[in-house]
């Protein structure tokens, strides 16, 4: 437990001088007791001076303050006691419900499981959301990314997934709010409370008003808690909203530390930082971590280095499209852009694969015909193409679905559609069983039976 003194403060960057024989290691946690502030060592500058990043506000810091070295990286509470609680990056409770009372603490910087410890699974995880279950099915213990620009529904989709999976799966969940709005964190808490699954969720928040060091580490805090449950042999759901803010915090820290920026101003260590986090989110022979990550796409550009780096780590990608949202189709998932490694006849079965493929083929053909329709009109199309267009429009409408978490806004009750019903519905549309129904009957319904019922009412 060596002590040092603050020698320089520039925003969130604090330089601390220690005796030459007691210099802290990189990633060690230091504490300024008088301010209750934790610093994390990032660089050793030589001459006994270390450069640190503050985990909280550095307002009011001054040179000469005493700093104590804890001798280890940041540790956070893990285990059963974290469930139903909201914590910050340091694992301190922020829900005014008293101390956590944890029995164990883990350091947030840990090694990823070794190659031989990892397990491979192809078991499907049903979400109850038609478009996801059909074209980009999730695997239990897999990694899923929800990609989308601002305001296309990443958080609402994630809330619905939590609502559907946490209820049906009845396992444990860890939610890491990385650089998102405080209001969303608040909404999430009450949503979980109303659903009665609060006692199965641990929440870790580092909102967008927090300093960059805090936002950079909060994902690791949440992941550490999820790893503990996994190592106890449980199946955990790990939600991150939003992984882009993690990258952004890394960019800010990198700039503060004076590193030369790389493409588009991102940190030169972008791929490595993303890898450090993503490699730890994995399933072992003891338990599984199924992770769902929201990924903000700057200016709707999927080739931006941040989303492009994230793509490489995922098993399934759910791409949300502004064009689809503008048609009033929610969830605004693009069935042609979204992908999944699970969409393989050997995993999902031949029927599911053929139906998903058929849906994508029809929608792709419709996309190609749109230009012809815009110039020459529908009358110039062959009968076969006309049928394709009518079916594609029905499929587009049928891909929409009322959500449980959006009942307040839409006024229509949420619907959970089983995979069997999803395949049956789309197969019927492709086979022409519902050619006689008006396309509006397919909009915002659950199963295909509801669409038929809606059409008959009219």
From Swiss-Prot:
Q: What would be one Gene Ontology cellular-component term for the protein? A: plasma membrane
Q: How does it sit in the membrane?
A: Peripheral membrane protein
* Top enzyme class: translocase
- Keyword Transport: yes or no? yes
Look up keyword Translocase and say if it applies: yes
- Which Gene Ontology MF annotations are present? ATP binding; ATP hydrolysis activity; proton-transporting ATP synthase activity, rotational mechanism
Q: So which residues are the signal peptide here?
A: none
EC number(s) stated in the UniProt entry for this protein: 7.1.2.2
Catalytic activity reported: ATP + H2O + 4 H(+)(in) = ADP + phosphate + 5 H(+)(out)
Q: Which residues form a coiled coil?
A: none
PROSITE patterns, per database record: ATPASE_ALPHA_BETA
Extract the Gene3D superfamilies matched here. 2.40.10.170, Bovine Mitochondrial F1-atpase, Atp Synthase Beta Chain, Chain D, domain 3 (1.10.1140.10), P-loop containing nucleotide triphosphate hydrolases (3.40.50.300)
Q: What is its main location?
A: membrane
In terms of domain of life, where is this protein from? Answer: Bacteria
Tell me which UniProt keywords the record has, alphabetically.
ATP synthesis, ATP-binding, Cell inner membrane, Cell membrane, CF(1), Hydrogen ion transport, Ion transport, Membrane, Nucleotide-binding, Translocase, Transport
Q: Where in the cell is it found?
A: Cell inner membrane
Could you give the subunit structure recorded for this chain?
Answer: F-type ATPases have 2 components, CF(1) - the catalytic core - and CF(0) - the membrane proton channel. CF(1) has five subunits: alpha(3), beta(3), gamma(1), delta(1), epsilon(1). CF(0) has three main subunits: a(1), b(2) and c(9-12). The alpha and beta chains form an alternating ring which encloses part of the gamma chain. CF(1) is attached to CF(0) by a central stalk formed by the gamma and epsilon chains, while a peripheral stalk is formed by the delta and b chains.
Q: Which PANTHER family match?
A: ATP SYNTHASE, ATP SYNTHASE SUBUNIT BETA, MITOCHONDRIAL
- Family named by the database record: Belongs to the ATPase alpha/beta chains family.
Function of the protein = Produces ATP from ADP in the presence of a proton gradient across the membrane. The catalytic sites are hosted primarily by the beta subunits.
Q: What is this protein called?
A: ATP synthase subunit beta
**Per UniProt, what is the name of the gene that codes for the protein in this document?**
atpD
């Amino acid at each position: 437990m060596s002590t040092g003194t603050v020698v320089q403060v520039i925003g969130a960057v604090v330089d601390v001088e220690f005796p030459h024989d007691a210099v802290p290691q990189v990633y060690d946690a230091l504490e300024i007791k008088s301010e209750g502030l934790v610093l994390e060592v990032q660089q050793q500058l030589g001459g006994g001076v270390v450069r640190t990043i503050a985990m909280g506000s550095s307002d009011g810091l001054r040179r000469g303050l005493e700093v104590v070295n804890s001798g280890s990286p940041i540790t956070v509470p893990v285990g059963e006691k974290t469930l139903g609680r909201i914590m910050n990056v340091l694992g301190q409770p922020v829900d005014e419900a008293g101390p956590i009372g944890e029995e164990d603490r883990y350091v947030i910087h840990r090694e990823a499981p070794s190659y031989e410890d990892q397990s491979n699974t192809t078991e499907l995880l049903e979400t109850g959301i038609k478009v996801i279950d059909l074209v980009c099915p999730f695997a239990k213990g897999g990694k899923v990314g929800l990609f989308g620009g601002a305001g296309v529904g990443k958080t609402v989709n994630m809330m619905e997934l939590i609502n559907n999976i946490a209820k049906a799966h009845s396992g444990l969940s860890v939610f890491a709010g990385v650089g998102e709005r405080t209001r969303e964190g608040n909404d999430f808490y009450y949503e979980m409370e109303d659903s009665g699954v609060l006692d199965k969720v641990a929440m870790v928040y580092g909102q967008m008003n927090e300093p960059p060091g805090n936002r950079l580490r909060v994902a690791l805090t949440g992941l550490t808690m999820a790893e503990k449950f996994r190592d106890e042999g449980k199946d955990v759901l790990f939600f991150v909203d939003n992984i882009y803010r993690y990258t952004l915090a890394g960019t800010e820290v990198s700039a503060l530390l004076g590193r030369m920026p790389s493409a588009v101003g991102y940190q030169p260590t972008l791929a490595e930082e993303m890898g450090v986090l993503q490699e730890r989110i994995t399933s072992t022979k003891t338990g599984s971590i199924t992770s769902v990550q929201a990924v903000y796409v700057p200016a709707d550009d999927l080739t931006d280095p941040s989303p492009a780096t994230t793509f490489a780590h995922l098993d399934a990608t759910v791409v949300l499209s502004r064009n689809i949202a503008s048609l009033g189709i929610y969830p605004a998932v693009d069935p042609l852009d979204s992908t999944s490694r699970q969409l393989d006849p050997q995993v999902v079965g031949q029927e599911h694969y053929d139906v998903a493929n058929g849906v994508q083929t029809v929608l792709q053909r419709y996309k190609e015909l749109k230009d012809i329709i815009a110039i020459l009109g529908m009358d110039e199309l062959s009968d076969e193409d006309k049928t394709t267009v009518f079916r594609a429009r029905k499929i587009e409408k049928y891909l929409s679905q009322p959500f449980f978490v959006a009942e307040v806004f839409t006024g229509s009750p949420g619907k959970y559609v089983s995979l069997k019903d999803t395949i049956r519905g789309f197969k019927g549309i492709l086979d022409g069983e519902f050619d006689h129904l008006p396309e509006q009957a397919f909009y915002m319904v659950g199963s295909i039976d509801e669409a038929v019922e809606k059409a008959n009412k009219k």
